[in-house]
């Protein structure tokens, strides 16, 4: 790709977004994906897979703080965490901030993602790959959760959209495997797209997850990079109290953890579970 050109996202056919490319840092097709990292004056370094923006330096903290601190603080005493995907290392970075976590396992299908992100997105991982609690497994996520003998308190599915390599992480086989290796009272979370534009993804996930978990819902966060703005995260557990904890309980856990965040706070945590009426209506109609 030539520099000083426009890069257009290809996720949607009728609308979309573009970024000015100031400098291409990396562009190569691996066995699994078409990977590119380029620099943009407004958003810093931008990573895209198969024509879809995955992360930018400017606003990645919103996505990663909400994907980690919401389930970890809701759980309250998570010791073993599994990350599916997350090769850029930012999810790992946020999990390592929880000192009570004893083991962090990350399953990434493509070793190339990890290697080039260590080089080209160092602010994302911030040295977290060297944390002694961390183990990297190069494997398919569905295979891992259905074969592993390990169990986890929190599972974070940092999956791409349900097309191509990411499609398997939205299947019943994957959700059943996650239930299989979750400890009692454990929490599963996953990105579920921008609900206003990709509502079918949320409805499909809710329908499938409900076969394996007694409490299934969603929470949301405003993330500018993802076209449409409001990202939806799937939530599944067998402890229905965890989705309804008071701000006082979350505040106490937040304080005890010694976290300092740029987006997440206890009030945001509680408010994130308030969903728009159109989503309530769509879920009720299923």
UniProtKB/Swiss-Prot annotation:
What family does the Swiss-Prot or TrEMBL record give for this protein? Belongs to the spermidine/spermine synthase family.
This chain belongs to which protein, by name?
Polyamine aminopropyltransferase
Q: How does it assemble?
A: Homodimer or homotetramer.
Cite the binding residues for S-methyl-5'-thioadenosine. 33, 108, 140-141, 165
Which HAMAP family does the record cross-reference, listed alphabetically?
A: Spermidine_synth (MF_00198)
Q: Which reaction does it catalyse?
A: S-adenosyl 3-(methylsulfanyl)propylamine + putrescine = S-methyl-5'-thioadenosine + spermidine + H(+)
Q: Which positions does UniProt annotate for spermidine binding? A: 64, 88, 158-161
Q: Which organism is it from?
A: Salmonella schwarzengrund (strain CVM19633)
Provide the active-site residues from the annotation.
158 (proton acceptor)
Function of this protein?
Catalyzes the irreversible transfer of a propylamine group from the amino donor S-adenosylmethioninamine (decarboxy-AdoMet) to putrescine (1,4-diaminobutane) to yield spermidine.
What GO molecular function annotations does the UniProt record carry, in alphabetical order?
Answer: spermidine synthase activity
GO terms under cellular component: cytosol
The EC designation for this entry is 2.5.1.16
Concerning InterPro entries, the annotation shows: PABS, PABS_CS, SAM-dependent_MTases_sf, Spermi_synthase, Spermidine_synt_N, Spermidine_synt_N_sf
Q: Which UniProt keywords apply?
A: Cytoplasm, Polyamine biosynthesis, Spermidine biosynthesis, Transferase
């Amino acid at each position: 790709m030539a520099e000083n050109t426009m890069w257009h996202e290809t996720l949607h056919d009728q609308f979309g977004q573009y970024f000015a490319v100031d400098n291409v840092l990396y562009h190569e097709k691996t066995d699994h994906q078409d990977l590119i990292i380029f620099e943009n004056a407004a958003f810093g370094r931008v990573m895209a897979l198969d024509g879809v923006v995955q992360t930018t330096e400017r606003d990645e903290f919103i996505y990663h703080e909400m994907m980690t601190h919401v389930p970890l603080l809701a759980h309250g005493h998570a010791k073993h965490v599994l990350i599916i995907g997350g090769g850029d290392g930012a999810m790992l970075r946020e999990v390592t901030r929880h000192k009570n976590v004893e083991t962090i396992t990350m399953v990434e299908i493509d070793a190339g993602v990890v290697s080039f992100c260590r080089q080209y997105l160092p602010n994302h991982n911030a040295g977290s790959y060297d944390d002694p609690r961390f183990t990297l497994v190069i494997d398919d996520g569905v295979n891992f959760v259905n074969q592993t003998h390990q169990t986890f308190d929190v599972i974070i599915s940092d999956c791409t959209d349900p097309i191509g390599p990411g499609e398997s992480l939205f299947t019943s086989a994957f959700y059943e495997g996650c239930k299989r290796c979750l400890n009692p009272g454990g929490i599963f979370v996953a990105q579920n797209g921008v609900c206003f534009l990709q509502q079918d993804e949320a409805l499909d996930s809710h329908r499938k997850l409900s076969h394996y978990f007694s409490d299934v819902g969603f929470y949301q966060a405003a993330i500018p990079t993802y076209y449409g703005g409001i990202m939806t995260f799937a939530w599944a557990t067998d402890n229905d109290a965890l989705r309804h904890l008071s701000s006082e309980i979350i505040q106490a856990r937040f304080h005890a953890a010694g976290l300092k965040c740029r987006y997440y706070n206890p009030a945001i945590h509680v408010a994130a579970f308030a969903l728009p009426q159109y989503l309530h209506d769509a879920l009720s109609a299923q």
